[in-house]
Amino acid sequence: MRNHCLELSSNCSSIFASSKSNPRFSPSKLSYSTFFSRSAIYYRSKPKQASSSSSFSTFPPCLNRKSSLTHVLKPVSELADTTTKPFSPEIVGKRTDLKKIMILGAGPIVIGQACEFDYSGTQACKALREEGYEVILINSNPATIMTDPETANRTYIAPMTPELVEQVIEKERPDALLPTMGGQTALNLAVALAESGALEKYGVELIGAKLGAIKKAEDRELFKDAMKNIGLKTPPSGIGTTLDECFDIAEKIGEFPLIIRPAFTLGGTGGGIAYNKEEFESICKSGLAASATSQVLVEKSLLGWKEYELEVMRDLADNVVIICSIENIDPMGVHTGDSITVAPAQTLTDREYQRLRDYSIAIIREIGVECGGSNVQFAVNPVDGEVMIIEMNPRVSRSSALASKATGFPIAKMAAKLSVGYTLDQIPNDITRKTPASFEPSIDYVVTKIPRFAFEKFPGSQPLLTTQMKSVGESMALGRTFQESFQKALRSLECGFSGWGCAKIKELDWDWDQLKYSLRVPNPDRIHAIYAAMKKGMKIDEIYELSMVDKWFLTQLKELVDVEQYLMSGTLSEITKEDLYEVKKRGFSDKQIAFATKTTEEEVRTKRISLGVVPSYKRVDTCAAEFEAHTPYMYSSYDVECESAPNNKKKVLILGGGPNRIGQGIEFDYCCCHTSFALQDAGYETIMLNSNPETVSTDYDTSDRLYFEPLTIEDVLNVIDLEKPDGIIVQFGGQTPLKLALPIKHYLDKHMPMSLSGAGPVRIWGTSPDSIDAAEDRERFNAILDELKIEQPKGGIAKSEADALAIAKEVGYPVVVRPSYVLGGRAMEIVYDDSRLITYLENAVQVDPERPVLVDKYLSDAIEIDVDTLTDSYGNVVIGGIMEHIEQAGVHSGDSACMLPTQTIPASCLQTIRTWTTKLAKKLNVCGLMNCQYAITTSGDVFLLEANPRASRTVPFVSKAIGHPLAKYAALVMSGKSLKDLNFEKEVIPKHVSVKEAVFPFEKFQGCDVILGPEMRSTGEVMSISSEFSSAFAMAQIAAGQKLPLSGTVFLSLNDMTKPHLEKIAVSFLELGFKIVATSGTAHFLELKGIPVERVLKLHEGRPHAADMVANGQIHLMLITSSGDALDQKDGRQLRQMALAYKVPVITTVAGALATAEGIKSLKSSAIKMTALQDFFEVKNVSSLLV
């Protein structure tokens, strides 16, 4: 059994040793004597009794509190009685009266609702099917494991509206509805279905959370009253349903700032912090519009208070357990999804933790969540310990996924089983196989989660953090101390940091005013501002006063700065084995040490290994090593004992995609999971390495072994050295593992490690790193295309500003410019003249020989095509799917709607595409997946835009459109199977039409323009399937949240380049009964064509103008394309923002407008018909092909 005590022994720390061994590491040089203080986790004397957070028996001395919480909080006995009446024994235990259960998914990935609900939904489907229930699933997101046809018995990939869900209920007749696995989307749907009478009409029971409990937790007024009933405090507040009511509440509270929280919304959408009356009015308007019940809570600000969360579970026998405590490093005022969080809570005494635990149990009982998981959020005053209850989520949440991965306790799986009658003591713990789920998890490590942001994708928006969530992803890391897990989590973000500090960061060049502002005002880079402030000599007390980040955390961070300073004061050769162990125990990466000692990462690694300083791997076991863990879920540390125990089976290491970001999201995790499933079926042990807590890939039972580690070359090579797998797969995780392909290959070529199975050397499976580089290196790729006689747009590689201007002059404007080696169109732009090109080169990118910029002719008015193809190691190539984009070329493929099969492309063009794709796959020696993008001009010329010999974000969509799991096939061909073995030898062209539409987070980023371009900005996608394109497109728009009007007024404002299409667009909407209004130039064009149109003023032409019509509800659909004129650009931007604020559908491309007209025509002529995925094609059982 491992030692629970994480306190470092002074005997093993040479930094504490006498100056005789190494004078540079003398204690006398420390800034204070507590340099290497103990972790916040202490030895627990009664682990069986305590929960994950109850181990903190000693209160950190640096906390600025006048007293303990004891005198402030009521004893448990003083809480109002919330015990429930005993449950009747006949309903405790698995229910046999239920046969069919419907699960509501979460829909597309949006900010505030991401992969974690695929994780929870997948767990729920598996858990219920294990128990023999028939599962019906509704979800519009194709990039999910839960929507695979084998996950549920009946799968509907369709819009999630009350009317369409009711249609499925009528058709499938489920006995029960489980709404707690799909986030806010599912909860709101369940409430709507219950209140409309649909559930009662068809005899459907809500399980997991009853209607009363959902409303009591989600309705701000009911929740406030409930807390009052049990004697718990909430911030002084009031409920407003109109703007006047909101101002009345503000008057009563009496001071700014004020927090505005809309009811029944996701990720704080529509809410915020108001510091004055103008901001208050704006946020209240937004919140009232965003709330499903037009209700907002206006409450006193608790800015600067500490924030904690507890994950709670309750069963039908009224057993309640606390799964995990979570502490936000950022104080109140920052949405918990945007805060750096730590589990278990680090700055609570045991007594304080027990109080919050008691409150959580009282709350879940008062709200009435009979069974399942809930998340409770607390605010604690750092001065006197006063506690306020912030909110409660009566469902599986983002924090639930984090708590599940942090503890190994599968909250969603347990919640699903509890919903059908099981009690916690009746469900075994999968990890220990000896303890029941009623044992509260105990953990002997620290977990840190850090959010990832994408403000650079939304120019014009302010990079500030408030109560409205804005992060697009997150990383998580585990370590034996906070310092270790924090540094690992930071380098897991893949934002250019190898840890905290030991790097050239912009904040070091800031003056004191800039630094103080960044410390005071929450922003994505505040943690780096803390580093810069400490480096510049700012004291902990001052940083605390500015940031309100707890002094315990600041003390821990200051120690890291001191370690960095020690490293910088000497050379690598001076560092002893003991010194290196102490530095690595604090999470410092080889790259950080190299920076500090002015050496290279490879030199540090060589020295470290020569000294025998290698990581050990610990198991996540839910019980702090009290019982053996049977599931190999590992994290690295520089502790003594290694618990990994690798074996000599045939095995494959799969590198995941890391944290979600725009351009690399759930689609790549989907591919990684399918790879693992397929190779397990083929008899391989699969090993997953990833750092994203939201995903299915990091579920402990997705692969045979899981390493929760950063995706850096250091951490990956450490696992390779330990496991020595037969193969390493880099093709499925997006750009993250691809960047590691060449360094891994160089390492394998140099050291030639042999696999533990004895089958030969460790090697990268699939397409070679050299072929990947050939496709991404522009000069090599151009040479290949010239050899194969494949056409591409005219262009060149610019290594200076002069090069770029010369290429643009040669090919002619407009041109597309972008840096090489990017994903998601990062820093890609269309420019129309020299001045804009110069501006781009000065502001967006650095151009030099080391960082060339690609300059290509922009093919305006061309149609873009996406092709996913599959190639085996025998040279056989099969087209997986050819997708036609609805938006013209120039809009990033990830942001464009697309359809499969193609609808308007001539057969000759399709044949050219098939021929070129096949030739290229063979030339690059592709083994696995490849994605190619083409453009077809109006004259029928075909051009190849780019090729990526890896899995693309369209693979899940294509797989579900054609009924073949392409990622599984790709994994199997890498293992040596042929496409003939898999019975996949020719392109499948389905009879039905599938449409994929992108979903955008514009409402979260006020001030940014919603117009689409070559830089990807969508966070997720939806899919629909129908017999005709028009109905499939309409369904996709509804699923994406676009409420298409069936009548009313259409506003048109088109630039000169798109006016040739204007007549067709206007006639299409007139024939549907719409009225047309247009700005002067557009109206003049239509009048010349004899088309009835009403003129409306542009914003700079006077009042009433187009924005007034939007505000007055006189415009129901808008088409605005951007022109080069500065005033028109400003007007168009403001109108598009106005449309977003008033929820008016806005279209920014001609093709999108024409498709929308077709979709509206379909909606007016016939009702949407819901069809299960299993009715379109037979479910493919890949394992049967391997027999």
From Swiss-Prot:
Residues annotated for ATP 2 binding in this entry: 818, 857, 859, 864, 890-893, 933, 946
S-S pairs: none
Induction: By phosphate starvation in shoot.
Pathway: Amino-acid biosynthesis; L-arginine biosynthesis; carbamoyl phosphate from bicarbonate: step 1/1
Tissue: Expressed in roots and leaves.
Subcellular location: Plastid, Chloroplast
Domain MGS-like residues, every copy: 1042-1183
Family to which the UniProt record says this protein belongs: Belongs to the CarB family.
Domain-level remarks: The large subunit is composed of 2 ATP-grasp domains that are involved in binding the 2 ATP molecules needed for carbamoyl phosphate synthesis. The N-terminal ATP-grasp domain (referred to as the carboxyphosphate synthetic component) catalyzes the ATP-dependent phosphorylation of hydrogencarbonate to carboxyphosphate and the subsequent nucleophilic attack by ammonia to form a carbamate intermediate. The C-terminal MGS-like domain is required for catalytic function.
Protein name: Carbamoyl phosphate synthase arginine-specific large chain, chloroplastic
Provenance organism: Arabidopsis thaliana
Upper classification of the organism: Eukaryota, Viridiplantae, Streptophyta, Embryophyta, Tracheophyta
